[in-house]
Every structure is written in C-alpha cells, then in structure tokens.
Amino acid sequence: LVDGVNEKGLSAAALYFSGEAQFAKQAEAGKANIAPHEVLNWILGNAVSCEDLGNQLANLNIVAAPVKLMGISVPLHWIITDRSGACYVLEVVADGAHYIKNPVGVMTNSPDFGWHLKNLSNYTQLKPTPHPARDYDGFQVNSFGPGSGALGLPGDYTSVSRFIRTVFMREYTDQVSTDQTVTQMSHILNSVEIPKGVKIKKDGTEDYTQYRGYMDTQNSIYYMQPYDDQTIYRVALTEDLMNKDQPTEFPIQEKQQFKAFN
C-alpha cells in the first residue's frame, strides 16, 4: 500500500526519499517494528488523526528490511492529512525520526522536507497577476500580459521544481466543493505529471507518473486516475467494505475510455 484513507478520515501517502532515508538496522523490544513499506498500513490501521499518530510514533521503530517485490529496503517518507485539515510529514533520517507540521500541504521526493520549505524563499516573486510596467530612464516596458507573474516558475521534472509548481498551483487555484475539487486537483497535478519518455533514469528505464490518487478525508473516498486511462475512478469506504474479511479488488481499464457522440 502506498496511499489511502481510513474510516476516520486520516489519509497518507508514501513517496520516494532516496539518498535521505535512514532506517533502524535492528528491531527494538517493546516497540512496533515494521519495514518502511509497511508503515502506511500501520498508520491507517492504528491512527485516527495527525495528532493521534504523533502521540504513537514513540512506539514505532521503522527497520530497514527489503520488500520482496523489489529486493531492497525502500527509501520512503510520508505525508499525512486528517479530517480537520491538519497535515504532517514523517521522515526518518540520520539523526532520527521527524514528524513535521506541513504548512503548505505539499510533498514530493528528496531532499528533506525542511530543505523544500527553505527553497520557497527563492520564489516569493511568483503571483497570478501580471507584473506592473517598468520605467527604464524614460523608456516604459510592459509585461506580455496575464501569466507574467509566474515567470520564473520552474518547469522541469525534478522533485524540487515539482514542489514549487504544486505549492504555487495549490495556493492560487479557485476553492471549490468536493466533486469539483477532484477535477481541480487533476488540473493541478497536470502541471507535474511526468509523461513516458521525458524522464530517463541512469539505467535507461523510464520514470513516469503511473497514476494519480485523490483522497476525500471528509467522506473517506478514494479517487484514482491511471496513466493509461484518464477516467477518474471512485471508491467509497462503506460499511459493507469495512465488514468484509477479504480484500476487495476493483478492476480498472488499461486503455483510454472515450465517450463517443456518433
């Protein structure tokens, strides 16, 4: 499990934190000892809010242990949000675990979250309105109109630039209701989605956005938008689902669906 929401409206997502994450090498007696890839399940299965999670973290020990699918201990950090709107980031680095209040509601990958917050200082000039005209020794220069306030917004696919873009988009997009919010979030994440072929790793493999997940903490609803089909799928955490004793799978399409008019 890499993201999800529980019946109390607590949501969490695990993101890659390569080069930064440093987990315990051994288990500790009297603590919940789990691997990095098990943390999200533990969070959603044990906590009801961000505050509640913070109170339980002293009893958690994240141990470097490989996931069978990959054969490695996955370097991860986590973003957690609850029904009150509180948002936190959990990172485990060389000097221990850090549970950090997230004032911007955004997280990407490495570097550490504190670095990303400091880097925002380089982009305080960004705004949704045009820059005013300037006078250079009597020569008046006008901006090229709407959109000029975002000049300098980084456009590459690094985690650093994606963080800046998402913070900017989140800050200035219109505030809307739940169903509209999902559509709004889809538009926001369009700006940071990585298409196949534009980001190649050192080993020659592609890094791309396999899917987007949207979580409604008020109603415990999960929305998924896969790469190969931009249809948004919706699953509500109903009483019926919670009472099942076996996992329930919901199939999604592997090719883009179209609404044909003729």
For each feature predicted by the language model, list its residue ranges:
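Aromatic- and glycine-enriched pocket-lining scaffold segments that form the walls
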Residues: 50, 54-91
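Alpha/propeptide regions of enzymes that mature by internal proteolysis
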Residues: 30, 34-60, 168-194
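A contiguous strand-loop segment
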Residues: 1-31, 59-60, 64, 251-253
